[in-house]
Amino acid sequence: MSKPVLSTGLRWLWLVLVVIAIDFVSKQWIMNNLMLHESMPVMPFFNFFYAHNYGAAFSFLADKGGWQRWFFAGIAVAIVVVLLVMMYRSKASDRLNNIAYALIVGGALGNLFDRAYHGFVVDFIDFTIGDWHFATFNIADCGICIGAALIVLEGFINPTSKRSEHKG
């Protein structure tokens, strides 16, 4: 009993491709225009800074000898599969959740490509204010974080409708 793909959340797969494309093009531009660890000021508080991240967010487990590359790749594959199944099971009209899932899938695949091809993730978005410095990140990370925030927002907007759907 298959259903038409366009009636499911998979209708939002175009957004996955947009995130992957912007992430890929931006990382290619950074790798072609900056040397590793080179900084390019954009604004007083915002720089492009070319970095290799061998770990996860905030360089978690970056110095653990290489096994983390495949560990985080496996986590990314699992998350992508779960979210694609969730998108298939949801209605295309469930916009907020499907947009959130698509952003996360696009971000996960963008970073997965880096891990598989380079052995590290290319990070380059760098914010500093005075002595405060935020961890360097990339467009894929933005997709993941915005998607996660949208899932939380959906929980606040429709907390009871989701619970009743799962009960009945």
Swiss-Prot record:
The active site is at residues 123, 141. Coiled coil: none annotated. GO terms for molecular function: aspartic-type endopeptidase activity. It is a multi-pass membrane protein. Pfam families: Peptidase_A8 (PF01252). The lineage of its organism: Bacteria, Pseudomonadati, Pseudomonadota, Gammaproteobacteria, Enterobacterales. This protein specifically catalyzes the removal of signal peptides from prolipoproteins. One of its GO terms (cellular component) is plasma membrane. It comes from Erwinia tasmaniensis (strain DSM 17950 / CFBP 7177 / CIP 109463 / NCPPB 4357 / Et1/99). Pathway: Protein modification; lipoprotein biosynthesis (signal peptide cleavage). It catalyses: Release of signal peptides from bacterial membrane prolipoproteins. Hydrolyzes -Xaa-Yaa-Zaa-|-(S,diacylglyceryl)Cys-, in which Xaa is hydrophobic (preferably Leu), and Yaa (Ala or Ser) and Zaa (Gly or Ala) have small, neutral side chains. Belongs to the peptidase A8 family. This is Lipoprotein signal peptidase.
